[in-house]
UniProtKB/Swiss-Prot annotation:
Biological processes, Gene Ontology terms: DNA-templated transcription
Database matches in InterPro entries: LysR_subst-bd, Tscrpt_reg_HTH_LysR, WH-like_DNA-bd_sf, WH_DNA-bd_sf
Main location: cytoplasm
Organism: Haemophilus influenzae (strain ATCC 51907 / DSM 11121 / KW20 / Rd)
Recorded GO MF terms: DNA-binding transcription factor activity; sequence-specific DNA binding
Compartment list: Cytoplasm
Record protein name field: Glycine cleavage system transcriptional activator homolog
């Protein structure tokens, strides 16, 4: 870490008095804003000028002007004090309202976020996550929700949007089902019940990808949620086509196995999103950075 030396910093009260007086070009208005006397403002500015060894103001009768050096110094000090104020406000907000309200599609919450949430809690014990599952691809982002996970094409307007990952669709089956009826080549898919999620579209895309013109994609049960379809596959009710990220824990614990090197991209992806007026919210940005890095790390393993 870089070691910073603060030996030549002027007093904060002097900087505040200068910034306010320079903004108003008036000691009187600066005194009103800072709730002190005009004499106190004048004294603080004299201290600052003595510290810097330069004149910051030109005093002409009843008017006040900045010197050229004073103008340059004001621009920098104004920015610094604004950032100091914003940083303090963010910290106080975090202290008084530690909650982070997150909305996610139910399957993403069940399959990935909840199993990993303890990692975030260990890194940020001061932030209390409140998780809401929604029955739709796009998490619900409103005034009560700080941040959401969306599943889609990433074309949402007026939001901060970051893709979490680009995933392939995997053909998954239980080890028991594969032991009874192995899948060695694409033609073997015809011997199995197809499990669908929402629609038959993904199986149609896979059939086209594998050049299986006669695969009957209309047969087999259809589920509204991926976690239900994965459970059906675990219990040997057929083979399922699912996003790798959502099936990661089942693949890792061996309850489902991927068959055939499909390399078919999921046309949709998961995104972390929030409103543009929350770009400086430390809780939101901490969670965004954590989830992006966590998923990226899993991809590299």
């Amino acid at each position: 870490m870089e070691i910073l030396m603060y030996k030549r910093l002027p007093p904060l009260n002097s900087l505040k008095s200068f910034e306010s007086a320079a903004r108003y070009l008036s000691f009187t208005k600066a005194a009103d804003e800072l709730c002190v006397t005009q004499a106190a403002v004048s004294h603080q500015i004299k201290l600052l000028e003595x510290f810097l060894g330069i004149d910051l103001f030109k005093r002409k009768n009843r008017s006040l002007e900045l010197t050229e050096l004073g103008k340059a110094y004001f621009v920098d000090i104004n920015k610094i004090l604004r950032r100091l104020n914003e940083a303090t406000e963010r910290l106080l907000t975090l202290k008084t309202d530690p909650h982070l309200n997150i909305s996610v599609p139910q399957t993403f919450g069940i399959q990935w976020l909840v199993p990993h949430l303890s990692e975030f809690n260990q890194l940020y014990p001061q932030i209390e996550v409140r998780l809401t599952g929604v029955d739709q691809d796009e998490g619900l982002l409103n005034k009560e929700i700080d941040l959401a996970i969306y599943y889609g094409l990433g074309n949402w307007q007026n939001l901060q949007v970051d893709r979490l990952c680009e995933e392939n669709l995997l053909i998954l089956a239980s080890p028991e089902l594969l032991a009874e009826n192995p899948i060695i080549q694409p033609e073997d898919l015809k011997k199995h019940t197809l499990i669908h999620i929402h629609t038959c579209d993904n199986w149609q895309a896979m059939a086209n990808h594998l050049q299986l013109d006669d695969l009957n994609i209309q047969q087999g049960p259809l589920f509204s949620h991926t976690f239900m379809a994965l459970q059906a596959a675990i219990h040997g009710q057929g083979i399922v086509l699912a996003n790798r990220l959502l099936a990661l824990q089942e693949i890792e614990n061996g309850s489902l196995q991927a068959v055939l090197p499909t390399n078919l991209p999921d046309p949709k992806s998961f995104y972390v999103v929030n409103h543009l007026d929350r770009l400086d919210d430390q809780k939101i940005q901490a969670f965004r950075q954590w989830i992006i890095n966590s998923i990226k790390q899993e991809e590299n393993e």
